């Protein structure tokens, strides 16, 4: 079933794709109107924006962050072309001096991010932008667009792969994706999340990842009979011979004809290495069990039995519970669209401001009637605490950027909303990792992304730091994201200050 192979060189085709598709105007109009407002009323402020999300996708307990490489490429290639300026001028909104500024625009700020493939949780910054206010404002929309999409698909893929319990998941969703880019980059994210490969040839070319595929019902129907179709395909692809057996009747026609072809291959001395059948409809549990019996009786008990047909993590988990004899899964629509959770929900919020004549950032906070939507102020970082014996995540701690954690010190963690919920972590029992790393400094890339297959391997290790209770699909155990005492005090003081002003 593996038609393509992984290339040996680091792929730069993705960067060429991003350059060929100028994404500078991939922004909401109000980012540009605000930029003109800042331009006309200059403050020379440097600001900090945090990109984070509030609710885990698909009812789970975690997410997988993805899309960082494309975000970096977007930042590197920010440039308003003459055509861009001409179009903006035609809107009759922007003045000539502002358009002149845009014609020479470059991003000069710093960006920190959590590496792709990392397990992440609500309210912790996935991306932190530190830049002049006009620059930080412009990049909001594209950062959200890129990170939200790929993180959603990577998370869905991680769930699907977990349900498969080690079986290969093939990403088959291109034809159902919401457009070419969703198909290309969704497949990339799906592989980061754990898929073995994709049917999308362009994704394979751009990212040097395995491309996978069998054949369609139309192949069978174009021949006089099913056997001839199978035999012809087997001659063409003897080392990747997976036969689709449900065009007419799985058990009466498809499997018997597949067995006949396999027997003939064996008699002709053709090695049966990567071979098997695919079932795309019907009762997959029953049909796979019966097909396995037939294959085993003919001496082909090692044949791969692949299934497709609107699969997702819930159906795969159910089929596993029914002891379905399936060991390879083609997952399309419900993966590439994350159909039960169509949006990731990431947001981009101002956290701090520094005036031109100041050396310190002033923390900012956004209020809400919903307590969980009140933002965390200031210049922050994120630490992850691991249990030293098990390697499992104990908690994440959002701190102010100047705070350092000492793993030898005792620590009291508390819930930032229900502050009476506390736990003590003894020094020497945990390890600490800072999650945010610099990826852009003064507008230049300082981070080289691993290959997609390396990110996939990293993501598997990341997921192994979760307890199984946090990976189950129904009522998963929450992983706690706490605030340091210093950050919590700052947040409380700002809330009290705003509350007092409201009473004046």
Which residues does each PLM region occupy?
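Residue-level recognition of short, solvent-exposed, well-ordered loop/turn junctions
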Residues: 6, 115, 121-122, 432-434
């Amino acid at each position: 079933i593996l038609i393509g192979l992984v290339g040996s060189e680091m792929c730069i085709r993705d960067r060429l794709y991003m350059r060929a598709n100028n994404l500078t105007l991939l922004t909401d109009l109000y980012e540009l109107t605000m930029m003109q407002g800042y331009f006309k009323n200059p403050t020379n402020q440097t600001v900090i924006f945090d990109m984070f999300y509030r609710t885990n996708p698909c009812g789970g307990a975690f997410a997988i962050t993805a899309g960082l490489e494309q975000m970096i490429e977007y930042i590197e290639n920010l440039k308003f072309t003459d055509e861009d300026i001409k179009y903006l001028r035609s809107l009759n909104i922007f003045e000539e001096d502002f358009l002149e500024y845009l014609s020479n625009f470059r991003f000069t700020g710093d960006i920190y991010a959590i590496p792709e493939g990392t397990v992440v949780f609500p309210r912790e910054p996935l991306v932190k932008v530190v830049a002049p206010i006009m620059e930080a404002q412009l990049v909001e929309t594209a950062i959200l667009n890129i990170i939200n999409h790929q993180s959603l698909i990577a998370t869905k893929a991680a769930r699907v792969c977990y349900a498969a319990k080690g079986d290969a998941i093939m990403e088959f969703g291109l034809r159902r994706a919401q457009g070419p880019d969703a198909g290309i980059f969704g497949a990339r994210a799906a592989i980061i999340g754990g898929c073995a490969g994709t049917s999308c040839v362009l994704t394979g070319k751009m990212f040097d990842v395995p491309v996978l595929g069998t054949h369609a019902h139309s192949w069978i129907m174009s021949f006089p009979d099913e056997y001839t179709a199978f035999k012809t395909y087997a001659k063409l692809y003897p080392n990747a011979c997976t036969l689709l057996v449900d065009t007419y009747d799985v058990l009466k026609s498809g499997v018997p004809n597949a067995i006949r072809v396999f027997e003939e291959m064996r008699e002709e001395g053709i090695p049966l290495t990567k071979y098997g059948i695919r079932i795309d409809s019907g009762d997959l549990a029953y049909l796979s069990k019966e097909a396995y019996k037939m294959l085993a009786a003919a001496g082909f008990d090692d044949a791969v039995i692949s299934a497709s047909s609107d699969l997702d993590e819930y159906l795969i988990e159910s089929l596993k519970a029914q002891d379905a004899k399936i060991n390879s899964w083609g997952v399309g629509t419900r993966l590439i669209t994350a159909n039960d959770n169509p949006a990731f929900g990431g947001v981009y919020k101002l956290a701090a401001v520094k005036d031109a004549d100041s050396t310190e950032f002033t923390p900012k906070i956004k209020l809400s009637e919903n307590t969980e939507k009140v933002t965390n102020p200031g210049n922050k970082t994120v630490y992850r605490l691991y249990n030293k014996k098990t390697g499992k995540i104990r908690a994440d701690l959002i701190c102010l950027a100047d705070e350092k954690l000492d793993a030898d010190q005792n620590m009291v963690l508390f819930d930032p909303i229900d502050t009476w919920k506390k736990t003590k972590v003894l020094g020497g029992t945990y390890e600490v990792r800072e999650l945010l790393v610099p990826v852009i400094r003064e507008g230049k890339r300082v981070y080289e992304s691993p290959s997609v297959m390396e990110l996939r391997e990293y993501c598997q290790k990341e997921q192994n730091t979760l307890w199984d209770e946090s990976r189950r699909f129904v009522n998963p155990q929450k992983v706690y994201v706490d605030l340091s005492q210093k950050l919590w005090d700052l947040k409380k003081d700002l809330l009290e200050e705003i509350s007092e002003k409201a009473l004046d």
